[in-house]
Every structure is written in C-alpha cells, then in structure tokens.
C-alpha cells in the first residue's frame, strides 16, 4: 500500500468534485498533480502542488484553488488539517490513526510491502560489467557490477521482467594481446624465460593459463609461429578468463542470465543486417567527416568512410561504422548487438558503462532510437571511479593483477555485503571513496554498520520479548493496540516507513538503486534516534511493563525490520540479526 498514492487519489477525486461543482473547468490534465513529503517536516506530513499546476490551464488564481481544495480535503476522516502556504501549495497533516494503521498494514503485507506493479511485466534488459575477458575484475568493475545487479533486483521488485546480460568483448585486438601474453606464460611453464613485452598483460593470473596450455598441448606449440597458435590460444585463454570473471561475479553475489559474444556477431551477417536496417531508413551514407576539435578519436580518418547519420536522432556528429579499408569500426558491432536486443523483444534497454564511455552515450541512444523506431528507450548509466584508501593512504595495486586492485582484493578484505552496500552509498555518476578501515568501523559514520545495527537492535527486542513469553509473530503483532504509538518520534518513524513504497517506485522509474541505500540510512537514523531517546525517556523504550503497550512498540520495531530487510534484499545484502 502506497499511502502517498492513496492520498493523491483523494486529491484528484476532490478536484473532480470541484469540476462537477463548476469550480474548475472540465478536461483538466491532472497527470502533473503530485503528493509528496514536504521539504520541511514542520510544514506537515504531505504536500500537493495541485493548485500550482492547475492555475494556468484553469485560468484561476492558485491560492483560490488551494483554499477550495483545502476545505474539501479537511472533511476527509484521514486528514487532520489542510493548510494553504505561499502562492498556493497545500500542506496536509494526517490523523494519528492513519499512521498507526500503517504498522498493521506492513506486518500483514510482510515482505510484499513496498513491492510494486508499475513495471507491468515489461521486459527490460540490464547489460552491465561487460569487462574485457583479459584478466580478473578490478575495483571499477565492482561498482558497475553492484549498481547493475542492484538495479536489476530493484526493477524486478517493482514489477519488471528483468534479464541480466554480460557482453563479452572477445572480437577486438585486446584478445589477441591476451593470447600473446598467455603464450609467454605457456613458455614459462616449460621452463623458458617469459618475454612480457610492453603492451602485454603482466599479471600473475596468467600463470595458471600457461600451465593449462601446457597440460593440453604439451610442447607442441613451442616451435610454431604465431599464425599457427594464435586462434587456439586466444579461444582457450578467453574461456579461462571468462571462467575467472564468472567466479569473481559469484563472489560478489552476481549471477548473469545471458552472456553474449561480440565475436559471434562477426561472420554471421548480424552487423550487415543492422546496418542494412539503418540503410533502409536512409541513415547510412558514404562521406568524409570534418576533423574533430581537440583529441582525435580512433575512428576518424581524413578519407571517405561509411557513416551512420546519428545526428538525425540527437547525436552531435555522424559516426563512422566502416573504415575506408573495409573493416568495421568499434561502433558497428555495438550497433548490431543492440539491434539484437531490440529484436529479442525487450521493451526497455539499460546499459551500465564506465565513465570513460561518456562519449558513447549519444551515438548509442541514436542507434537504438533508429533501430526501434523510437519504441525502445535506452538509458545509459555511467559509473564513476572508485578511490581506494587504507591506513590513510591510497591502496596499492595487486601483484596478481599486475596493475590494479582486483574484485577479490576488495571482497577478501571486507566481505561481499560491505562491498555491495558501500558501492551504493553514492550516486553512480559521483566519484566514490572506499576506505578499507572506515567501512569496517562500528560507528555512526559507517552507513553499512549503521543500517545493520538497526536491524540487529530490532532482533534483540524480538528475542527478549520471546524470552518473556510473548508471541511476536507478525500476525499477532498486527492485532496490537497501535493507538498506543502516539509519541511524535514514533509517528515520525512510521511516516518514514510509509515512504518506502513511494521510494521504490521513484528509484525504479529513475533507474537509481542508490536511493534505496540512502533511504535505509535515513530509516536507521530514525530508529536509532527513537532507541537513544528511550535511554532517557522510559516511556519510549520498546519493551515496557504494560504488555499492551509493549506489544504495540514491538510491532513498530518489527515493521521497521520488515522494511530494512526488504531494502537490503534489493541491494543484495544479507541482513545481520546480531552484531558480533
């Protein structure tokens, strides 16, 4: 149950009544009418912009609309007051019984409280990580993996049919570099000195690949030229790298539904089919692009190329898809891959890219808009850098990887749950500081601990209540005398719980799972605040001598626990029942 949706329904119903009474003209568009928490809680429990958005189309002063609407709303038994503020904003206060009833609603709904159907079963493809299969996942991949997986969980929670997908970049030159690097480790496995030339991958992670190559091929490749072993070693090493990446993802609690190969697009006609589709729309032509200002991109050349007219769909310049020598640009297989997604019947596409792919956003959106005739929206989320710190200094590289901190480095130091939560404590497009010391601190400043400690405190209340012989099942707690929850701090905590269904829908519509982490921190803060006040005010403690009062307060604590566990589930974090 979304209380904000319920009150918005009341507001629109009263606006309809005003229309019938002749106070408003017929045919007004009410889609922009919103009911939200006010910016300042002192102004009320909810606020609506109805009068402000209807003033111009109705030709009436906003304050006059607000005053008439306030009179009608104040007559509803759920509303204790409706006050006009400023030029026409309307602030509402709800009766305590509405808030108290929310506790029973949450306990009866259990883990379905907050779940939404706004996705309406639409098929959404979330492509994320898609790291080159050339080594173990690094910390930058970790953030993208967590954001993508949490987003997929969020969308499923809100009613979408979600497919998690990994695009294997196995068609470019980097996998040839991988093969050459692995071959040097193969030579090393035979007792020869590896020649890790500049440009090759130096990490120790390729040593097992070399040993595996030796086990499979013996010394049969040692005396052969590159042209005889490159293809076999490339495929062998790529598969071993993908197995390593799958294990890395599993360590992070991420499971993909689909792995798609870039290499599979070549030689199958899929690239040609996608470009033929664009050609049918007169979006492919032969031409010479003006030289770009500043840094020259890899796909620019001062000769005639095959170009995609991406400017027809919002891009800044048209983009090359085939070079003058007849080879494809990097963009061509990406177009084909996204066309494949469109033809698989997805209603929505989401790509999670590293921040260094920012220049790709407009061209990729243009391609999808053209290939889907505007039917399939593409949202691209850019993941900013993660800065690692330990002992007050930047965290050093991993010897195993050779050049960077790996996913395993992070997870082995702090655990999967801490890693996942911390990666969602900032919006995806903001740089994130990950301090190995601070994320393990048991302090208010550590958001992971703060939220988990709230859940642990709730479970301690439930344990003590059981020890006293109380029935603390959700069904029994839902029948508690909830009007005993009348302190402003208790009402404020319930009001925060009431925001959960609305928060879920906003986060899902904007594809922003970090909002869930932010909300959980706010909810934990309300719970801890009430708990700490109980240290000074005995009447606010969750366990009371009066069993009727105690049951009501335990019901509130349990309702908070329901929402915390639901939120942590979306983040892919296991709730802690007891702090150790």
From Swiss-Prot:
Residue ranges annotated as motif 'HIGH' region: 131-141
Leading EC class: ligase
PROSITE patterns registered for this protein in UniProt: AA_TRNA_LIGASE_I
One term under GO cellular component: cytoplasm
Gene: argS
Reactions accelerated catalytically: tRNA(Arg) + L-arginine + ATP = L-arginyl-tRNA(Arg) + AMP + diphosphate
Keyword entries, A-Z: Aminoacyl-tRNA synthetase, ATP-binding, Cytoplasm, Ligase, Nucleotide-binding, Protein biosynthesis
Quaternary structure (record): Monomer.
Location in the cell: Cytoplasm
Record's protein name: Arginine--tRNA ligase
GO MF annotation list: arginine-tRNA ligase activity; ATP binding
Domain of life, per lineage: Bacteria
Family per similarity comment: Belongs to the class-I aminoacyl-tRNA synthetase family.
Gene Ontology BP, a term: arginyl-tRNA aminoacylation
